[in-house]
Amino acid sequence: MAHATDVHQHIWPEELVDRLRARTRPPYLREWVLHTEGEPPYDVDPTAHDARARVALDHEAGVGTACVSLSAPLGSEALPRRDAAPLIRAWHRGVAELPAHFKAWASVPVTDPDLDGLRALLADPRHVGLQLPATQLLTPGAWERAAPVLAVAEAAGTPVLVHPGPVPRSGLDRDVPGWWPAVVGYTAQLTSAWWAWHAVGGRRLFPRLRVVFAAAAGLAPVHHERHVLRGGQGEPVDPDVFVDTSGYGPQALDAVVRVLGIDALVLGSDRPYAEPLAELFGEAATRAIRVTNPQRLLGATVVPQRQEEAA
């Protein structure tokens, strides 16, 4: 089978690690322990962020290109601009030094994003599109407020990745288990962002924008029957709205495909936190999810690297 494109991975370049270690308030690193505002301290495996080792792992999984993004749950984008900008600059400079196997999602601060700088990033073939935290897109009005950066991505012909953002500590009891933010908080964010896109008429606002929601949009599409039951208007499947496979397996993804069809599903592993999906629903569906659909999402501008080229 042809080499796959994984549209959702994470890797921390050295400069970003240094910036996180220099901070004294969340998000910050002490040695390899990550501290964020809303989640328990997390022991980071440094080998998971070794670029050459990652390339080898991806090749073993048949992945020829990995699209990496700044970990939005860190909350970097939502920091005051003076704090957000250095972290985001470190991210962009760091990914520019990665092997050709990696492409990157650009990021911008929530406050006063540099639109000209974003245009320049999206004109660089190393960047496949723009990532926005779902926490920035929770309501119809939030999508409208994000219009300036969304319009830049649309004009560039590049997609937008909607990724879970930080989970606020203020909304959690102290005794919730460690898995709570990822299982409850992240999925709630994605569900809100999915339905906010539909409620605002996202396709009307951005006729040519391609959008991909991480983690199957928190399974929001599966609630389409409830949406109609409660007064929502049924809509045809939008061929330019995608969901990735991260965090779910055959049972959940089967339900999503029954609503959106196979063409909406793209390979996104969330590596290093999970492995790329190797097979789903037979050979033809697997090829669509791992090869054809990701290329369509990315505008066919990314062709998976041959192994000898990608290293």
Where are the regions a protein language model picked out?
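Divalent metal-coordination and catalytic microenvironments
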Residues: 8, 58, 95, 130, ...
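Catalytic pocket-lining loop regions of alpha/beta-barrel enzymes
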Residues: 124-260, 264-266, 309
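Mid-to-C-terminal alpha-helical segments outside catalytic/metal-binding sites
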Residues: 2-7, 13-65, 93, 209, ...
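Short glycine-enriched loops at secondary-structure junctions
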Residues: 110-111, 164-169, 272-273
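Short aromatic-enriched loop/helix-cap "lid" or pocket-rim segments at secondary-structure transitions
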Residues: 15-20, 79, 117-118, 172-175, ...
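Short beta-strand segments
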Residues: 6, 67-69, 107, 213-215, ...
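Mid-domain alpha/beta scaffold segments of enzyme catalytic cores
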Residues: 1-5, 9-136, 144
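Flexible, glycine- and charge-enriched loops at secondary-structure boundaries
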Residues: 44, 81-88, 184, 188, ...
